[in-house]
């Protein structure tokens, strides 16, 4: 796993995946990238960031420029920083199989199409990073933290399955399938208000 943007979203994604057995090999912030092909201790890196330090303060890894995180070969590459970080000029550098988008619109449409043509699976931002909205809803309805986390996992898993099945069935990009799902749900919700 490589995480581009080790802030709130990036830290939580890295922690969640590490708990599932994934190995973090790279992470970056605005000060640089830390890379270790043998793995980075996620809890220790989070502690470093929580002390207002940078990922490059992590001992036991190679310190690289911030942009170098794009070049790290990995199974899962998580953009969790800002929009349009991957575009036509750098998309060829990305060597991964799965991209759960943690940031909002981290790829240009052209870059997303190019990755799709290379069989890179992209989970759209508003599906993959919906945890905050789901958590707020759970809190609003009086749910506990453990209930909120369970709901987040269940909802994101179910939405991801539905989007990927629709994309496969209709031979479209996952983002298009996700937009269609969202539009259908909004129309349905609006029909209840009439």
Residue ranges and their predicted role:
Residues 64-74, 82-99:
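Rossmann-fold NAD(P) dinucleotide-binding segment
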Residues 1-73:
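Glycine-rich phosphate/diphosphate-binding loop of Rossmann-like nucleotide-binding domains
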